[in-house]
Amino acid sequence: MNQTLLSSFGTPFERVENALAALREGRGVMVLDDEDRENEGDMIFPAETMTIEQMALTIRHGSGIVCLCITEDRRKQLDLPMMVENNTSAYGTGFTVTIEAAEGVTTGVSAADRITTVRAAIADGAKPSDLNRPGHVFPLRAQAGGVLTRGGHTEATIDLMTLAGFKPAGVLCELTNDDGTMARAPECIEFANKHNMALVTIEDLVAYRQAHERKAS
Protein backbone atom coordinates (compact mmCIF):
# COMPACT_ATOMS: atom_id res chain seq x y z
CA MET A 1 0.00 0.00 0.00
CA ASN A 2 1.31 3.48 -0.92
CA GLN A 3 2.35 4.92 2.44
CA THR A 4 2.43 8.47 1.07
CA LEU A 5 -1.31 8.29 0.44
CA LEU A 6 -1.88 7.16 4.02
CA SER A 7 0.53 9.52 5.78
CA SER A 8 -2.19 11.95 6.87
CA PHE A 9 -3.63 9.14 9.02
CA GLY A 10 -0.34 8.62 10.90
CA THR A 11 2.10 5.74 11.14
CA PRO A 12 0.87 2.15 10.79
CA PHE A 13 0.68 1.69 14.57
CA GLU A 14 -1.03 5.06 15.01
CA ARG A 15 -3.57 4.09 12.38
CA VAL A 16 -4.49 0.95 14.31
CA GLU A 17 -4.73 2.84 17.61
CA ASN A 18 -6.83 5.56 15.96
CA ALA A 19 -9.11 2.92 14.46
CA LEU A 20 -9.66 1.32 17.87
CA ALA A 21 -10.39 4.73 19.40
CA ALA A 22 -12.87 5.52 16.61
CA LEU A 23 -14.73 2.25 17.18
CA ARG A 24 -14.95 2.92 20.92
CA GLU A 25 -16.36 6.37 20.12
CA GLY A 26 -19.05 4.83 17.92
CA ARG A 27 -17.48 5.91 14.64
CA GLY A 28 -16.76 3.82 11.60
CA VAL A 29 -13.42 2.69 10.22
CA MET A 30 -12.29 2.33 6.63
CA VAL A 31 -10.23 -0.85 6.20
CA LEU A 32 -8.04 -1.15 3.11
CA ASP A 33 -6.44 -4.33 1.88
CA ASP A 34 -3.41 -4.66 -0.37
CA GLU A 35 -3.39 -3.26 -3.88
CA ASP A 36 -2.53 -6.70 -5.27
CA ARG A 37 -5.34 -8.43 -3.38
CA GLU A 38 -8.93 -7.16 -3.65
CA ASN A 39 -7.70 -3.54 -3.64
CA GLU A 40 -10.87 -2.42 -1.86
CA GLY A 41 -11.92 -0.38 1.12
CA ASP A 42 -14.58 -1.67 3.47
CA MET A 43 -16.59 0.45 5.89
CA ILE A 44 -16.76 -1.36 9.22
CA PHE A 45 -18.76 -0.74 12.40
CA PRO A 46 -19.19 -2.62 15.69
CA ALA A 47 -22.27 -4.83 15.46
CA GLU A 48 -23.13 -3.83 19.03
CA THR A 49 -23.25 -0.07 18.45
CA MET A 50 -23.92 0.50 14.74
CA THR A 51 -26.77 2.97 14.33
CA ILE A 52 -29.58 3.10 11.79
CA GLU A 53 -27.96 6.24 10.36
CA GLN A 54 -24.65 4.43 9.93
CA MET A 55 -26.40 1.50 8.28
CA ALA A 56 -28.16 3.92 5.91
CA LEU A 57 -24.80 5.50 5.03
CA THR A 58 -23.37 2.05 4.41
CA ILE A 59 -26.24 1.02 2.15
CA ARG A 60 -26.17 4.33 0.27
CA HIS A 61 -22.44 4.36 -0.45
CA GLY A 62 -21.65 0.65 -0.41
CA SER A 63 -22.08 -2.35 -2.65
CA GLY A 64 -25.43 -3.18 -1.02
CA ILE A 65 -24.03 -6.47 0.28
CA VAL A 66 -24.09 -5.71 4.01
CA CYS A 67 -22.13 -8.39 5.83
CA LEU A 68 -22.01 -9.42 9.47
CA CYS A 69 -18.60 -10.82 10.41
CA ILE A 70 -18.85 -13.54 13.04
CA THR A 71 -16.71 -16.26 14.60
CA GLU A 72 -17.07 -19.97 14.02
CA ASP A 73 -18.46 -20.30 17.55
CA ARG A 74 -21.23 -17.79 16.75
CA ARG A 75 -21.94 -19.54 13.44
CA LYS A 76 -22.43 -22.80 15.33
CA GLN A 77 -24.56 -21.11 18.00
CA LEU A 78 -26.88 -19.81 15.29
CA ASP A 79 -26.73 -23.07 13.31
CA LEU A 80 -25.89 -21.24 10.10
CA PRO A 81 -24.76 -23.53 7.28
CA MET A 82 -22.01 -22.27 5.03
CA MET A 83 -23.45 -20.95 1.77
CA VAL A 84 -21.65 -23.64 -0.24
CA GLU A 85 -19.79 -26.81 0.70
CA ASN A 86 -17.07 -26.26 -1.88
CA ASN A 87 -15.97 -22.61 -1.77
CA THR A 88 -14.37 -21.71 -5.09
CA SER A 89 -14.43 -17.90 -4.69
CA ALA A 90 -11.12 -16.19 -5.41
CA TYR A 91 -10.30 -15.47 -1.76
CA GLY A 92 -12.37 -18.13 -0.03
CA THR A 93 -14.70 -15.61 1.62
CA GLY A 94 -16.68 -17.46 4.28
CA PHE A 95 -20.28 -16.68 3.41
CA THR A 96 -22.97 -18.52 5.34
CA VAL A 97 -26.61 -18.58 4.33
CA THR A 98 -28.19 -15.14 4.56
CA ILE A 99 -30.33 -14.12 7.52
CA GLU A 100 -33.25 -11.98 8.69
CA ALA A 101 -34.49 -11.35 12.20
CA ALA A 102 -37.51 -13.56 12.90
CA GLU A 103 -39.25 -10.72 14.73
CA GLY A 104 -39.28 -6.93 14.55
CA VAL A 105 -38.74 -6.49 10.81
CA THR A 106 -40.98 -5.88 7.81
CA THR A 107 -39.32 -6.72 4.47
CA GLY A 108 -35.87 -6.84 6.06
CA VAL A 109 -34.40 -4.45 3.51
CA SER A 110 -34.47 -1.12 5.34
CA ALA A 111 -31.57 0.17 7.40
CA ALA A 112 -33.63 -0.25 10.57
CA ASP A 113 -34.54 -3.82 9.67
CA ARG A 114 -30.94 -4.74 8.94
CA ILE A 115 -29.86 -3.31 12.31
CA THR A 116 -32.60 -5.40 13.96
CA THR A 117 -31.25 -8.49 12.20
CA VAL A 118 -27.66 -7.75 13.24
CA ARG A 119 -28.66 -7.26 16.88
CA ALA A 120 -30.69 -10.48 16.88
CA ALA A 121 -27.73 -12.43 15.54
CA ILE A 122 -25.21 -11.15 18.09
CA ALA A 123 -27.42 -11.24 21.21
CA ASP A 124 -25.83 -13.19 24.05
CA GLY A 125 -28.59 -15.79 24.14
CA ALA A 126 -29.28 -15.83 20.41
CA LYS A 127 -30.88 -19.04 19.13
CA PRO A 128 -31.22 -20.39 15.59
CA SER A 129 -34.97 -19.73 15.77
CA ASP A 130 -34.30 -16.00 16.28
CA LEU A 131 -33.34 -15.80 12.61
CA ASN A 132 -35.09 -16.60 9.36
CA ARG A 133 -33.17 -17.83 6.34
CA PRO A 134 -32.65 -16.42 3.73
CA GLY A 135 -32.56 -12.70 4.38
CA HIS A 136 -30.87 -9.41 3.61
CA VAL A 137 -27.82 -9.65 5.90
CA PHE A 138 -24.84 -11.75 4.79
CA PRO A 139 -22.92 -13.38 7.65
CA LEU A 140 -19.22 -14.00 7.04
CA ARG A 141 -17.40 -16.60 9.13
CA ALA A 142 -13.91 -15.40 10.07
CA GLN A 143 -10.96 -17.76 10.21
CA ALA A 144 -9.54 -18.52 13.64
CA GLY A 145 -6.33 -16.56 14.18
CA GLY A 146 -7.62 -13.45 12.45
CA VAL A 147 -5.40 -11.53 10.04
CA LEU A 148 -2.41 -13.64 11.05
CA THR A 149 -4.20 -16.59 9.44
CA ARG A 150 -6.03 -14.87 6.58
CA GLY A 151 -5.47 -11.29 5.47
CA GLY A 152 -9.10 -10.54 4.69
CA HIS A 153 -11.53 -7.80 5.66
CA THR A 154 -13.59 -10.38 7.57
CA GLU A 155 -10.71 -11.28 9.87
CA ALA A 156 -9.62 -7.65 10.16
CA THR A 157 -13.10 -6.72 11.34
CA ILE A 158 -13.14 -9.41 14.04
CA ASP A 159 -9.61 -8.48 15.18
CA LEU A 160 -10.44 -4.78 15.41
CA MET A 161 -13.64 -5.42 17.35
CA THR A 162 -11.82 -7.70 19.78
CA LEU A 163 -8.94 -5.26 20.28
CA ALA A 164 -11.43 -2.42 20.83
CA GLY A 165 -13.20 -4.39 23.56
CA PHE A 166 -16.36 -5.33 21.68
CA LYS A 167 -17.93 -8.70 21.01
CA PRO A 168 -16.18 -10.38 18.07
CA ALA A 169 -18.83 -9.25 15.58
CA GLY A 170 -18.81 -6.37 13.13
CA VAL A 171 -20.64 -5.10 10.07
CA LEU A 172 -18.78 -4.45 6.84
CA CYS A 173 -19.64 -3.30 3.35
CA GLU A 174 -17.39 -2.46 0.39
CA LEU A 175 -17.25 1.19 -0.60
CA THR A 176 -18.30 1.93 -4.18
CA ASN A 177 -18.10 5.05 -6.31
CA ASP A 178 -21.21 6.88 -7.47
CA ASP A 179 -20.93 5.26 -10.90
CA GLY A 180 -21.00 1.78 -9.36
CA THR A 181 -17.30 1.02 -9.74
CA MET A 182 -15.25 -0.12 -6.77
CA ALA A 183 -13.61 2.61 -4.74
CA ARG A 184 -9.81 2.34 -4.62
CA ALA A 185 -7.43 3.82 -2.07
CA PRO A 186 -7.69 7.50 -3.13
CA GLU A 187 -11.51 7.42 -3.10
CA CYS A 188 -11.54 5.52 0.20
CA ILE A 189 -9.26 8.10 1.80
CA GLU A 190 -11.45 10.95 0.55
CA PHE A 191 -14.59 9.23 1.87
CA ALA A 192 -13.01 8.50 5.26
CA ASN A 193 -12.01 12.14 5.66
CA LYS A 194 -15.43 13.38 4.61
CA HIS A 195 -17.29 11.10 7.03
CA ASN A 196 -14.93 11.36 10.02
CA MET A 197 -13.83 7.74 9.79
CA ALA A 198 -10.47 6.38 10.87
CA LEU A 199 -8.50 4.51 8.23
CA VAL A 200 -6.31 1.45 8.63
CA THR A 201 -4.87 -1.21 6.36
CA ILE A 202 -4.87 -4.95 6.92
CA GLU A 203 -1.07 -4.76 6.63
CA ASP A 204 -1.06 -2.28 9.55
CA LEU A 205 -3.14 -4.66 11.64
CA VAL A 206 -0.91 -7.65 10.88
CA ALA A 207 2.18 -5.71 12.00
CA TYR A 208 0.39 -4.42 15.10
CA ARG A 209 -0.73 -7.88 16.19
CA GLN A 210 2.65 -9.44 15.51
CA ALA A 211 4.42 -6.77 17.57
CA HIS A 212 2.03 -7.08 20.50
CA GLU A 213 2.13 -10.86 20.49
CA ARG A 214 5.94 -10.82 20.44
CA LYS A 215 5.86 -8.58 23.52
CA ALA A 216 3.40 -10.88 25.24
CA SER A 217 5.64 -13.87 24.68
Curated annotation (Swiss-Prot):
Disulfide bonds: none annotated. One of its GO terms (biological process) is riboflavin biosynthetic process. Mg(2+) 2 binds at residues 38, 153. Signal peptide: none annotated. Pfam families: DHBP_synthase (PF00926). D-ribulose 5-phosphate binds at residues 37-38, 42, 150-154, 174. The keyword ATP-binding does not apply. It is an enzyme of class 4 (lyase). Belongs to the DHBP synthase family. HAMAP family: RibB. This is 3,4-dihydroxy-2-butanone 4-phosphate synthase. It comes from Escherichia fergusonii (strain ATCC 35469 / DSM 13698 / CCUG 18766 / IAM 14443 / JCM 21226 / LMG 7866 / NBRC 102419 / NCTC 12128 / CDC 0568-73). The gene is ribB.
